Amino acid sequence: MDSPCQPQALNQALPQLPGSVSESLEPSRARMGVESYLPCPLLPSYHRSGASGEASAGNGTPRTTATATTTTASPLREGFGGQDGGELWPLQSEGAAALVTKECQRLAAQGARPEAPKRKWAKDGGDAPSPSKRPWARQENQEAKGESGVGCDSGGGSSNSTTHSSGEASSRLREEAQPSAPERLALDYIVPCMRYYGICVKDNFLGAVLGGRVLAEVEALKWGGRLRDGQLVSQRAIPPRSIRGDQIAWVEGHEPGCRSIGALMAHVDAVIRHCAGRLGNYVINGRTKAMVACYPGNGLGYVRHVDNPHGDGRCITCIYYLNQNWDVKVHGGLLQIFPEGRPVVANIEPLFDRLLIFWSDRRNPHEVKPAYATRYAITVWYFDAKERAAARDKYQLASGQKGVQVPVSQPATPT
């Protein structure tokens, strides 16, 4: 057993959704990294027909709306519910990832207009602060009043110096009032997406330079023989390699040759820290070490599973991908998430510099499709303090397991 933070395969008590469609979309039909669809029934309440009352097959030929007469149905194709055949509502059978990646230009270019999650004002029961004047705005008003009486003051020099010092104070207050980049990302994007979808995708998380350094360190771990076959928590008669085919290493981020991985974790910590208190009743006080994972490209994947099916304390899963020029039609390795109770599948391409966040519990069963090229990812799980403490008491975690949790890094104190 590597760690208590190894994802455990789904047991038979969980409902098994139908398998994915093997048919791939044509290049002209592919969008947002969605290469295949889960054959599942459509919900009439989610789809509004277009003016013609029929959905187009993407080539101008009308077709009737698909109905679920069996447990499997034809895969949805381009044009159905959101292109020329009607409006696609959030989480229609197309993949949550396609709808939560707000920055993607391909989605906007092809006419889909999903309903984006929006924050509510505090007075309406949301978490967004009520609009009010910032401290620097009040300071500027005071300055304006002071300047109106300067002409009547015989001590012009002292008034100018006072105004100058007030201006500096105003600038300082303005800088303090403006939210940081991680805070804006957390409050304006990640928190609404997690509440609305339970899944969040953020592209260009670190940027090409730092992301490239992280990739170089991960490749060095692989070629240095630091990776070991991933293990399962439960003792099963099934060979582990038939369930998961990755090789892993646990990294804290301060080891020699892992500084950039540590920087990645600090960036993720900063975002999650700003999400704390806004994602339900979770009290996030720590996380696991970073799990560096590599699928060697020999056609292995990871069967459908839930990261935390039995309440071991993990509440949020964060995965950072490092695969440049990845093409799922050629390389495979697609991550599929099957949100519980919804007839949808989120198809996530493991693209370079992409951060994926989702709930770790039974709400998000997921699997990694077989990979035919070297596939890298770094995963970290964040703990809910109450559930983690209960798990320690219930399962009497071994000493090796207790040592896995590390505190969420704090921002450096400015000097």
Curated annotation (Swiss-Prot):
Q: Where does 2-oxoglutarate bind?
A: 375
> What is the required cofactor set for this protein?
Fe(2+); L-ascorbate
Which reactions is this enzyme annotated as catalysing? Answer: L-prolyl-[protein] + 2-oxoglutarate + O2 = trans-4-hydroxy-L-prolyl-[protein] + succinate + CO2; L-prolyl-[hypoxia-inducible factor alpha subunit] + 2-oxoglutarate + O2 = trans-4-hydroxy-L-prolyl-[hypoxia-inducible factor alpha subunit] + succinate + CO2
Q: What are the disulfide bonds? A: none
The cellular location(s) given in this protein's UniProt record come to:
Nucleus
Q: Residue spans with biased composition (Gly residues)? A: 148-158
ATP-binding as a keyword of this entry, yes or no, is no
Which spans does this entry mark as compositional bias, Basic and acidic residues?
115-126
Q: Where is this region: Beta(2)beta(3) 'finger-like' loop?
A: 233-243
A single GO cellular-component term from the record reads: nucleus
What molecular functions are annotated in GO for this chain? 2-oxoglutarate-dependent dioxygenase activity; ferrous iron binding; hypoxia-inducible factor-proline dioxygenase activity; L-ascorbic acid binding; oxygen sensor activity; peptidyl-proline 4-dioxygenase activity
Q: Kindly list the biological process annotations in GO that this record carries.
A: cell redox homeostasis; cellular response to hypoxia; peptidyl-proline hydroxylation to 4-hydroxy-L-proline; positive regulation of protein catabolic process; regulation of neuron apoptotic process; response to hypoxia
For this chain the motif Bipartite nuclear localization signal maps to: 89-134
Q: How is the cofactor bound?
A: Binds 1 Fe(2+) ion per subunit.
Q: Where is the composition biased (Low complexity)?
A: 1-18, 49-73, 159-170
Which tissues show it?
Expressed in heart, kidney, brain, liver, skeletal muscle, lung and spleen. Highest level in testis.
Where, if anywhere, are coiled coils annotated?
A: none
Spell out the Pfam families in the cross-references: 2OG-FeII_Oxy_3 (PF13640)
- Annotated Fe2OG dioxygenase domain ranges read 286-384
What PTM annotation applies here?
Answer: Ubiquitinated by SIAH1 and/or SIAH2 in response to the unfolded protein response (UPR), leading to its degradation.
Where in this protein does the record put region Disordered?
Answer: 1-31, 43-89, 108-179
Q: What does this protein do?
A: Prolyl hydroxylase that mediates hydroxylation of proline residues in target proteins, such as ATF4, IKBKB, CEP192 and HIF1A. Target proteins are preferentially recognized via a LXXLAP motif. Cellular oxygen sensor that catalyzes, under normoxic conditions, the post-translational formation of 4-hydroxyproline in hypoxia-inducible factor (HIF) alpha proteins. Hydroxylates a specific proline found in each of the oxygen-dependent degradation (ODD) domains (N-terminal, NODD, and C-terminal, CODD) of HIF1A. Also hydroxylates HIF2A. Has a preference for the CODD site for both HIF1A and HIF2A.
> What's noted about domains in the record?
The beta(2)beta(3) 'finger-like' loop domain is important for substrate (HIFs' CODD/NODD) selectivity.
Oligomeric state and interaction partners are given as: Interacts with E3 ligase SIAH2. Interacts with LIMD1, WTIP and AJUBA.
What's the protein name?
A: Prolyl hydroxylase EGLN2
